[in-house]
């Protein structure tokens, strides 16, 4: 009904992508924007962790062919909302962050139960990461500079610890942080970005540790790059 309305009122044809199509477009976007395409084609296993605002999609490719995808209904926007929504005036920021970390581990149990067998491999899994939290974690500004940055699991853990220290020094209670971000306090945009990183990055760490992945490569390209490349070359 909505798609029909858009077509009739705006004259635009809109198509909703299936999981496989979205995963393929995401990986095509990464390839399209990467310099060392030959090296990438030699990777036997490639995993894409695409963390959006509402969910996180984990997709696996083997020798260039799509294997499977799994959607974890936790994204950075959901986690940020829960960080504040589940807190009271007496909830410390430490307690609130511990809650979101626990929630990630809890939701990942279903992923492990349903999908872990697909990801078990003696060969290393080349991992591509997409999303605001992971691109911000590069410490670089602009998608072009962020694209292709390699982050080790240890470096991501260090980033989480650094964010923890900074946020907890400045805000004792979760409500204090919420008030600052919501009402546009000093550097509120930067603080909000730190919150997004802090709640989003543990998802990558948990997946990397469980699957034995030592490092990942950040993609600074959007899904539309993949759609464009598919239409350009097909």
Predicted regions and their residues:
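Helical "lid/coupling" subdomains associated with nucleotide-phosphate turnover
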Residues: 1-45, 60-62, 67-234
């Amino acid at each position: 009904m909505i798609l029909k309305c858009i077509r009739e009122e705006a004259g635009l044809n809109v198509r909703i992508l299936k999981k496989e199509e979205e995963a393929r477009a995401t990986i095509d976007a990464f390839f399209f924007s990467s310099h060392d395409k030959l090296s990438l084609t030699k990777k036997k296993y490639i995993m894409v962790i695409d963390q959006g605002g509402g969910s996180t999609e984990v997709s696996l490719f083997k020798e260039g062919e799509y294997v499977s995808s799994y959607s974890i209904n936790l994204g950075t926007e959901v986690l940020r909302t829960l960080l504040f929504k589940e807190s009271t005036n007496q909830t410390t920021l430490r307690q609130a962050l511990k809650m979101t970390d626990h929630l990630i581990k809890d939701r990942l149990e279903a992923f492990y139960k349903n999908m872990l067998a697909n990801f078990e491999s003696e060969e290393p899994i080349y991992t591509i990461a997409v999303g605001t939290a992971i691109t911000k974690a590069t410490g670089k500004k602009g998608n072009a500079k962020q694209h292709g940055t390699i982050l080790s699991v240890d470096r991501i853990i260090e980033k989480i610890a650094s964010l923890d220290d900074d946020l907890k020094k400045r805000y004792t209670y979760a409500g204090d942080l919420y008030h600052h971000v919501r009402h546009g306090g000093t550097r509120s945009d930067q603080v909000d970005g730190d919150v997004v990183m802090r709640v989003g990055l543990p998802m990558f760490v948990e997946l990397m540790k469980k699957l034995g992945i030592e490092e990942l490569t950040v993609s600074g390209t959007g899904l539309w790059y993949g759609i464009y490349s598919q239409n350009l070359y097909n």
